[in-house]
Each structure stands twice: as C-alpha cells, then as structure tokens.
C-alpha cells in the first residue's frame, strides 16, 4: 500500500511504497490513492493525490505482458519520496473519488466488451459461411447455426443493456446539470431519483 506523509518543510505531500497493476502507469500525470491517515486500516484513511512525472521520485519496476489493450500499459510503480498534491479532501479518496471514477469506467469497459463480442461474432459468422464440410457451408448444420444464433442473441442483449445504461447515465447527468441552474420540478426530481439507482 502506498503511504502519504505531509512534508511541512516543502509544503507538499510525499508518497512512498509500491503500486501494482496500474493502468497507464507510464503516464505523465497520475491520480494516486494513498493512505494519508496514520493508524487507519480501512477506506476512511485513504486520500487521492495528483503526481506529476516531471517531479521525479517514481520508477516503473515492470510493465505487464498482457493479452490485449497494449495501448494502455499496466505497470508496477515504485514511489520513493515522490512529491504529490492532495486532490479534493482528505479521507475521501476511496469513498468518493475512486468510486466515481470506477462507475464511469464500468460503462467504458462494457462498450469495449460489446465491440469485442461483435468482432468475434463477425469472424465466427464469416468462417461458418466460408468453411465447407460434406459439400455445404457449416452454417447450414443445425448445431453450428444454433451456436451462432445464441452468440448473436447474447451480443444483442449486451448491446441493449449498454445502450439503456448509457441512456440512464445521460438522463441523470442532464437532470443533475439542470438542478445546478434552477430548482427541479417535482416530476424532474422523481425522474432523477429513478435514474440514480
């Protein structure tokens, strides 16, 4: 676990420790979750920090060899007295900030999954139409056709769930923005409550 201590002489936070499986670990800016409260052992002792690579103090110990998503390196990072700035309020790192980031990331991961599923289905369908067995395309065999039909049904269900969830998020965010400008009507408040779930 990464530990954060306040450096009063330099009026900044210092990060020490190791972080493993960090997405985009080679980025110039890091949002880092670290234990800022001495003697705590749960999420209430964690705060969010911003680290700038130009300030030094962090080494990439290793880059994971992954099966996919090579454009986003997953790294193991070693922080040695790395200068950082507090992001937001102390003790809300996990409870407020990370959970908000994770909820947004989940929708993106769902979209990636639907895209990968579509590509896999397209490949399987093309192969089943092209591959000949006993003088006909294997898609004409009931077992193969049923397999492809099941894949397509699950793909369509996943896409529908993604689109509906995205719609809910968009409506909730729109109502949230409107609420900052003016008071919501009772109907809008009810709708906001419905989409917040």
PLM-predicted stretches and their roles:
Residues 1, 25-28, 42-44, 59-63, ...:
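Short acidic, glycine/serine/threonine-rich loops at helix termini
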Residues 1-14, 18-29, 190-197:
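Flexible, glycine/threonine-enriched loop-and-boundary segments that flank and lead into catalytic domains
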Residues 7-12, 78, 106-197:
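Alpha-helical interface subdomain recognition
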Residues 12, 16-58:
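A short core secondary-structure module
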Residues 12-13, 29-31, 45-48, 74-77, ...:
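Beta-sheet entry/capping signal
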Residues 22, 65-69:
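Single-stranded nucleic-acid-binding OB-fold domains
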Residues 34-40, 64-66, 97:
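Generic N-terminal targeting/processing segments that precede catalytic cores or assembly contacts
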Residues 54-57, 73-105, 122-140:
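A glycine-rich, basic-preceded beta-loop-alpha segment at the flavin cofactor/substrate interface
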